[in-house]
Amino acid sequence: GIPICGETCFFGKCNTPKCTCNKPLCYKN
């Protein structure tokens, strides 16, 4: 739930491990 992945996502995938996509950012926990 914390946007600390430093990554944006638009297609439902995040490159950062253990990060999930919640447009427009990738979140971890």
Curated annotation (Swiss-Prot):
Species this chain originates from: Melicytus dentatus
Protein name per Swiss-Prot or TrEMBL: Cyclotide mden-H
Cross-link (Cyclopeptide (Gly-Asn)): G1-N29
UniProt cross-references to SUPFAM superfamilies, sorted A to Z: Cyclotides
Record keywords: Disulfide bond, Plant defense
Free-text note on domains in this protein's UniProt record: The presence of a 'disulfide through disulfide knot' structurally defines this protein as a knottin.
Paired cysteines (S-S): C5-C19, C9-C21, C14-C26
Any Pfam family matching the protein: Cyclotide
InterPro entries named in the record: Cyclotide, Cyclotide_sf
PTM: This is a cyclic peptide.
Function field: Probably participates in a plant defense mechanism.
A GO BP annotation: defense response
TM annotation in the entry: none
Membership in a protein family: Belongs to the cyclotide family.
